Amino acid sequence: MKKLLLLLLAPLALVGCKNTDKKEEFHGNDYGAFLGRIDNNVSGFKDYKYVSVELDEYTHTNIERLTNNGTNFLAYLNVGSLENYRDYYDDFESYTFKDYDNWPEERWIDVTNQDWQNLMVELAQGLKNEGAFGVYMDNVDVYSIAKEEEMSYQAFGSAIKSIISRINALGLKVMVNGGAEFFDDMNDANDNVFDSVWGYHQEEVFSLIDDYDDNVFGTQNDEDKAYYQSIASMMKDKGKEVFFLEYTTNETLIKNIENYCNSQEFHYYISNTIELL
């Protein structure tokens, strides 16, 4: 998900065990998602090849040191919704159109607004200047929300493609979180947006967040699980890096996730808290 949320929650244990049966050159648990970490604690980051973070929360010195050690920073960039704690909130609030379920501090935004698109590219340039390897592009699912709201989802799709292409042109890798329906439709249209996408990141493929307030997790339904897996396989076939982010404490489910991701050569991170601390 995202978030600079809960300051008072202590970090909880995070899951990731090396699979010694996997061929040596690939380890699926080389990815860490720390989007909720708000201090400058980079302890453990050196153990990961890829980490997703709110890059503004870390010093340039630490970013540079860890990058030199082989850690690649994927900096959070929310292209599809607007959070009320961003310093540009007042400038773009009028372009929002729908509340975001389970995240009361943000609303979906009309990405067709040219000023918004320009801001996303400007922010991405700043992230690159700070040492980002790429961006963790969140809330591309605004495309699906536009469909549900009977808005011009085609225009939303064109706007998303433009943002992706322009950010990739900066020399940044683009890892898109979610957007399964967007990519499904773009594949059907034989669109060239895939040329600008480096990675595909999907949450809750195997797991499901049942209660956002109390970190209660369940199991994803078979239909959605199969759909997410099919999109992930499609992206892999197109040569993209694939990442799963799961939320669970169920040992059987954890093992299933590990086995599946390692067999498919997908990167994965398993957390027992939605805060991703």
Where are these regions (language model features)?
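Glycan-processing catalytic domains of CAZymes
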Residues: D21-L277
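C-terminal motif of bacterial Sec signal peptides marking the signal peptidase cleavage site
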Residues: L14-G16
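Positively charged n-region of N-terminal signal peptides that target proteins for export
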Residues: M1-L4
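Sec-dependent N-terminal signal peptides
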Residues: L6-L9
